[in-house]
């Protein structure tokens, strides 16, 4: 989550909370998952507190802020409620993500270019908490330029279209978009992270891209953990990223 010469792994624990909320139980505990992830080599922990509270709850975020040994990457929509909460929690990293249809691009990233004044105000306000603010956007030059204009020091490129690509041609096209987006972002002085839909069979090509600071991965880790345990799932992903990014 901080700029590094080696590629970092941010572990998203949202779907541990999804499993808990499915039955309204106290288990499985996303905080325990976060601590296990750190032990297994995670460089940071990502959580998304959604307006509908479908997985992570405020209490999870408060507890994580107190116990994490790495850093929290707090994903949030651009709302007054979330801004006030972030100001109270003061996470090390904040990533602004789309939550409503109006904020989405067709690909699924935040439409920064279409709402620059609103995003600029949010970035400036959140930066005053001391957080490094990033924007979850498509690997699109227009959105990357807008991200720089609004003052965000970092971006997270949306890798969902690459993850969803089915034919070798589509995969190559989407990977090329990411490669070009990374180069364009780095060229504009931005810290470039990436994530969404990455799993054990598609992560290596993205991890091999020079210039990416961190990959944020969640659902694939939680799914694999059902069979191998959470620490092993994280360690396996970390090893893939380290090997591919050498």
UniProtKB/Swiss-Prot annotation:
Coiled-coil residue spans: none
Compartment(s) of residence: Cytoplasm
Binding site for 1-deoxy-D-xylulose 5-phosphate: 14-15, 50, 55, 105
Enzyme active site: 48, 75, 196
Site (Transition state stabilizer) residue list: 156
Catalysed reaction equations from the record: 3-amino-2-oxopropyl phosphate + 1-deoxy-D-xylulose 5-phosphate = pyridoxine 5'-phosphate + phosphate + 2 H2O + H(+)
A GO molecular function held by the record: pyridoxine 5'-phosphate synthase activity
Principal cellular location given in the protein's record: cytoplasm
Keywords: Cytoplasm, Pyridoxine biosynthesis, Transferase
Role noted for this protein: Catalyzes the complicated ring closure reaction between the two acyclic compounds 1-deoxy-D-xylulose-5-phosphate (DXP) and 3-amino-2-oxopropyl phosphate (1-amino-acetone-3-phosphate or AAP) to form pyridoxine 5'-phosphate (PNP) and inorganic phosphate.
Family under the similarity heading: Belongs to the PNP synthase family.
Designated name of the protein: Pyridoxine 5'-phosphate synthase
Organism from which the protein derives: Pseudomonas putida (strain ATCC 47054 / DSM 6125 / CFBP 8728 / NCIMB 11950 / KT2440)
